[in-house]
Amino acid sequence: MMPLTMVKAGEENTIKEETRRFLENLGFVTGGVVTVVSEIGGNMIVNVKDSRVAIGKDMANKIMV
């Protein structure tokens, strides 16, 4: 398990239970696939459930994959 900020662009990972509740409304669900599209200064653009979502560094650090 690691924070999303440690994932390389193009790499798919599975979201862990710890961050589930807050992120469900954005489409992040436990067991769901998240793919990092790009990362600049810790801020990330990710694909989740066929949508692109921009998330800040602080939030990305809370998403465990």
Where are these regions (language model features)?
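Compact, glycine-rich, soluble single-domain proteins
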Residues: M1-V65
